[in-house]
Structure formats: C-alpha cells, structure tokens
Curated annotation (Swiss-Prot):
Belongs to the D-isomer specific 2-hydroxyacid dehydrogenase family. GhrA subfamily. SUPFAM superfamilies: NAD(P)-binding Rossmann-fold domains (SSF51735). Keywords: Cytoplasm, NAD, NADP, Oxidoreductase. Disulfide bonds: none annotated. Pfam families: 2-Hacid_dh_C. InterPro entries: D-isomer_DH_NAD-bd, GhrA_Enterobacterales, NAD(P)-bd_dom_sf. Its EC number is 1.1.1.79, 1.1.1.81. The lineage of its organism: Bacteria, Pseudomonadati, Pseudomonadota, Gammaproteobacteria, Enterobacterales. This is Glyoxylate/hydroxypyruvate reductase A. It is found in: Cytoplasm.
Length: 312
C-alpha cells in the first residue's frame, strides 16, 4: 500500500514515521513536485493540483474538519480529482473536546458577566452587577454536525436552555431542534447566545447579517467558531454599536490574518483568537486515518466521507 502526504506546514518526516508505525504494511512518502509514482491514498492540506490530478486513488483524506478550501479548488479544477474517488475529512480527532472547552468557557464568561466586570475594572469602578439566570440565557447552535453535537452535550451540564438549527431534524436529548429557513426566526428570537458551527457552503456564506441579527433578542451574544465568511463584519459591528448585540467572540475571519486596519481589533465588545478554537492533533488524526484506511481495505463501512454536492 502506497500513501502520499502533503501539508505546507506540518512536519512531514514525523507524519511519515507515525503513519508507517500505525499502518505497518504501508509505505508512506512526502509528496514533492515531480512525484508521479503510483499511490493508493493521499493525505493532504491545500494540495497543488498536480499532486492529485490523474491519480487512481482509493481515497483522499483532508487533514482538517473543514473541507471548503479543497472543494473550492476541486470546483475550479475538476480534473484534479475524479468524482468517483471518495474524499474524507477528520471527523473529530480531538477537535470536539477543543470546541467544547472553547464554547463552554465563553458562554460562562458572558453568563457570569466577566466582560462587564473587565470594563468596570478598566474604569477602576467597584460595582457588583445583577446576575443573569440560566432561564434567560438560552444558547442556540447553528450547525448540528459532529462538533455541534459535542458543544451541545458539554453545555447541557450547565443547565442552559439549548436549541439547534440545521438542515435536518435532530433528536438530541434536552435540545430543541429547528430546521430550515422556515424555522430560523423561531430559533433566533429566543437565542441569547448564538454559536455558529455551520459548514462553509454557498448557502451559508454571509448568513450572519443584519437581517439575522435583528431577529435575536436585544443584548444577545455571537460566538463564531466556523468560518469568517459566515459573518458580514460590517453588520456585526453595527449591531454591537446599536446595542442589539452585547458582545461577540470571533475565532475566524473573512481575511486571515486579520488586517491591522480592521475595526474589529479596536471594538471594546469584540474579543478574538487567531483561528485556534480546534486544531488538528496529529496523534488523534493518525488514529482516525489509519483506522479508516484499514476499514476501507477490508471493505467495511466507514464514516467521515464528504458529500461534495452539499459541501461537507
């Protein structure tokens, strides 16, 4: 079994060694320009077109949970990968736990009003504030995939009212499920904290705009953990300035790194991190990939395959 590996920043030698330990019958090599030798599987992130074009692969693994970048390249270069070759994404590989940590810590930060107390501290003001109640702090999750399910599960322990919005109905214990555009308003109008975990598709680009934000309760919060292109940043800033939104926590942006001139840097009610909410953890990723390749070789059912038409 031949496996080729390409990632512009990962330590290729470490990955090659670890993969060969996990798959003793495989030969793994780092792909380099000019390598046209046969391969059965490809592990990639931002691959050049020529790496995959014309290859008779059994499967391709994207080294991340998001596959919008590779799908965009496939749409621009259909010759890059035959439609019959399955594409897999990393289903969890430790990302679920990271998303849980991030989401829970931020919801609690807002619930306990730590943002307000930091503002008071900056003014040297000693002023206890009224507490929020859990009943008035409903959390709504847009996107009910693997990571959305993990975040909902972690928030249940804290007693917040929970709801999710997705393409298909979910039956998660203790979570109200809303489906499609026709139920979006009902989902939004009782959501105090909006967590975005949507996939990046043509239907979701720019979805967090003034029309959507106006449907949230006054004083709501937005936590974006998905993709920067989901948010119309000017609309978000306008909602913060008007008081419609009380705060926003952003891990992703329409342009990364975020330009120095962006007003998001200086807005007092915007907090941010540099796209680190959930990163690929090599050991967990290799465990998933090696297990899935073994199942594919045996003809067993697998999970994590990307639906190219849907975009995730």
């Amino acid at each position: 079994m031949e496996i080729i590996f390409y990632h512009p920043t990962f330590n290729a030698a470490w990955w090659v060694n670890a993969l060969e330990k996990a798959l003793p019958h495989a030969r793994v090599r780092e792909w380099k320009v000019g390598d046209n030798n046969p391969a059965d599987y490809a592990l990639v992130w931002q691959p050049p077109v020529e790496m995959l074009a014309g290859r008779r692969l059994k499967a391709v693994f994207a080294l991340g949970a998001g596959v919008d970048a590779i799908l965009s390249k496939l749409n621009a270069h259909p010759e890059m990968l035959d439609a019959s070759i399955p594409l897999f994404r990393l289903e969890d590989t430790g990302m679920g736990l990271q998303m849980q940590e991030y989401a829970v810590s931020q919801v609690l930060h807002w619930f306990r009003r730590f943002d307000d107390y930091q503002a008071l501290k900056n003014q040297a003001l000693w002023k206890p504030l009224p507490e929020y109640t859990r009943e008035e702090f409903s959390v709504g999750i847009m996107g009910a995939g693997v990571l959305g399910a993990k975040v909902a599960e972690s928030l249940q322990a804290w007693g917040f009212p929970l709801r999710c919005w997705s393409r298909s109905r979910k039956s998660w214990p203790g979570v109200e499920s809303y489906v499609g555009r026709e139920e979006l308003h009902a989902f939004l109008n009782q959501t105090r904290v909006l967590i975005n975990l949507l996939p990046n598709t043509a239907q979701t680009v720019g979805i967090i705009n003034s029309e959507l934000l106006d449907q949230l309760p006054d004083g709501a919060y937005v936590l974006n953990l998905a993709r920067g292109v989901h948010v119309q940043e000017a609309d978000l800033l306008a909602a913060l300035d008007s008081g419609k939104l009380k705060g926003a926590m952003l891990d992703v942006f329409s342009q990364e790194p975020l330009p120095q001139e962006s007003p998001l840097w200086r807005h007092p009610r915007v907090a941010m991190t540099p796209h680190i909410a959930a990163v690929t953890r090599p050991a967990e990723a290799i465990d998933y990939i090696s297990r899935t390749i073994t199942q594919l070789e045996k003809g067993e059912p697998v999970t994590g395959q990307v639906d190219r038409a849907r975009g995730y």
